[in-house]
Each structure stands twice: as structure tokens, then as C-alpha cells.
Amino acid sequence: MAGPGARARIRLVAVAVLVMASLVTGCAPGRPHGPVGALAFWDRARLLAALPLGSGRVQRGQSHPAGSAAALRVGALFEHDASGNHFCTASVVASPGKDLLITAAHCINGGQGGSGYSSDIVFIPGYRDGQEPYGVWTVARLLVAPQWAKFSDPDYDVGFVVLQPHDGQNIQDVLGANKLPSDRGYRYLVHVTGYPDSANAPITCVNTTSRQSATQLRFNCPGYTGGTSGSPWVTQFSTRSRTGTIVGVIGGYQEGGDAPSVSYSVRLGAAVHDLYEQAVSGKTAAGQA
């Protein structure tokens, strides 16, 4: 893990390969990504070897099989390294480019004292038992706020991932997307779906959030161990339209929590919406391509 309270196992790799890095002004330079190498690495044999076989489990609710509505836009982040394990969770968020994920900042950037942005990340939506039903998606660019990149400020532990097209399609065209909130509340009935790094399938729990602080939310449900960082907190989910609103992602205080039964999230306020606008506009930091 990245630290005592981290929900993610991060290895920041200093490998320079071609990608366009999209960063916030003042943010640490992004680490480039190699889409061809990453795709070649994740063949089916490696996916099956990454984790032991088993079945998904649902906390305090009904099981959601692969491809179920609640988990449709959620996937595991894998890093191109020898360990072969997924390390975080991410989900599709609506954007004009139809190519955007939301996750925890600490999943994609080491923050203060770290090595900057992660390299060779791939996203596998609906991952289960070594299967990638919607393909393996490579990363175009990563984005976190400078308050995270420079100071590891827990109130800015949210990041965005822009994906490359896959087979001529964008991720939102394939899976749909949830949206960001327009209000700034503390209490929401949410579905939280994520990938523990010791399992080969997601877990899901439904519960009501509460206020941890003026800038943080809290969610109580068991089983959210390492690997669940970045898991979306989805409210107002419609099984008919298969859409909902993301009001949080596991991260923030204690990088999401140091106990698997209590999780935290940054409250998705103006700072996150500003970061989102920079992600969808393709703005870059001074000196970046």
C-alpha cells in the first residue's frame, strides 16, 4: 500500500513513452503511457493469473453479476508491472469527449514526496474472473489538482483519467456514464462498487453517507480493503436508464480509510468540478504539450 491508510498499492514507474499529458497549472509533470505495450501485456493468461478464482460478493444487498446495471460503468485499474494485480477502482463519468473516468488522486499520482504520475495504466470495465467483457482500455492522460500533487492534501484526493478510444469507440459510447452532482449535500443513499485487490470480482454495498467533516463524507460497510480506492459512490441510480450521480469516490481522509468497514470520500464540490472542466477541455500546464 502507499501508506498506512491507503486503499491502493501504487508503484510509480519512471518509464517515458509517448502520450499527451494533461495537467493542472502548477501540477507535477505527468508520466507518459504506452498504449500498445500495455495492451500486449494484458493477454488472457496474465489476467487469469493475476488473481485467484472466486465469485463477487455484495455487502448488505443482492449480488450483482458481471454486466449488471449497478456495476456496468465500474472497472479495475491495472498497472503494467510484474505483479499482475489490479490496484484501484475507477468509473465512467459523463463528459463531452465520452472518454473520462473518475478515481482517487492517490491511485494515479504519488503526491508529496512521490514520483509523480503513474505509468502504463489500463482500465478493464466489468472485470471478473480474468475476463474483460468490454475490452482493455489504455490511458491518454491523467489529471490531479496541484494541491494533491504538491502537498497530498486529502481534500483534493480525486483524479480524472482520459482514455484512448478502443476499437474505434469511446468508453461512454460502450458503457454509458454517471454524472457529477449539482448539489453539495452530505447524506445520500449510495451504491458503492469496487475491486478489493485480494479478489477477482467487485463487491457492492448500499448505505447512507454521513458527514465526516466540512469537506469529507463517510460511508460504513465492510470489506473495502486495498484496491477499492476510487470506487464511485452512486446515488439516484436508475435501473431503467442505468444512470446515476457520483457523489464521492473512496479516498480523501486516510486515503479512503485505514479500516475496511469505514470509508471516506472528498465532498465533490467546486474544486472537483473545476478539475473536471480542465479534464474535459484538455487544458495543460505551462510547458506541457
PLM region descriptions:
Residues 247, 253-289:
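C-terminal cap/linker of serine protease catalytic domains
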Residues 223-249:
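Catalytic nucleophile loop of clan PA
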Residues 60-83, 93-94, 109, 114-168:
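Conserved catalytic-core segment of clan PA serine endopeptidases
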Residues 103:
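Cytochrome P450 catalytic-core helices
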Residues 139-140, 154-227:
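Chymotrypsin/trypsin-fold serine protease catalytic domain
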Residues 107-108, 127-130, 165-168, 197-198, ...:
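Acidic glycine-/aspartate-rich tracts in secreted/extracellular proteins
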Residues 2-3, 26-95, 278-289:
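Protease-domain processing segments flanking chymotrypsin-fold serine proteases, especially trypsin-like
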Residues 1-31:
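Secretory targeting and sorting signals
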